[in-house]
Amino acid sequence: YYTPKSIVTLIVEMLQPYNGRVYDPAMGSGGFFVSSDRFIEAHADEKHYNAAEQKRNISVYGQESNPTTWRLAAMNMVIRGIDFNFGKQNADTFLNDQHPDLRADFVMANPPFNMKEWWNAKLEDDVRWQYGTPPQGNANFAWMQHMIHHLAPKGSMALLLANGSMSSNTNSEGEIRRAIIEADLVECMVALPGQLFTNTQIPACIWLLTKDKSGGNGKAHRKGEVLFIDARQIGFMKDRVLRDFSTDDIIKITDTFHGWQADKD
């Protein structure tokens, strides 16, 4: 289940993980961690720091259910010299959370879209379902709530989901979405163009959530506000079937987001 590299880069650039705990509960082979590592290297000159020293301020936590992919992710980190904690073993994120006490500064994931086979009766009154029990036939809001649960008090997160997550009212999804919005957790929504994925035609969006919109530290007070970015016309056709974002496209979207975060007229 592959996330396009440009979308991984976009999410990392939007979240800006310069230091703190980075967590991906559906990590695959660890693409978000590699991208976070590269992010620190890419911004070293502009921010006047030593990349190797700066990387010591990041700690990486991940989980993956597939044993081969889990080992591949570990290998990926070792090759790049990234310290990591991927739990004791590969495991189902919902049934066997490898980091139950983790509260991360940055949580990022591209879980499988509209995952049907995820429910187990043991999950009925789970502490993670703070905004409502997710429907048994779709894990979208289970992933989102799992990530919210693992956010530090001032943490931010980004989640790539199918567009249906913005409007679906199946079972409890509408109520959960309403509760999350009313809790003022949603910071920004990015609508993405179609044809970004090799394995699905489902159009996708990025949900960016944060526990703290009160501003300070160069950020504006944004309580009660949500930024909507329509990126559906952005990008270029890489070949006949696949669309992609250029570096300039990524900069355009991230500058829009960071400008809104900082600017208050």
Language model features by range: what are they?
Residues 101-265:
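A conserved structural/catalytic subdomain of Rossmann-like adenosyl-cofactor enzymes
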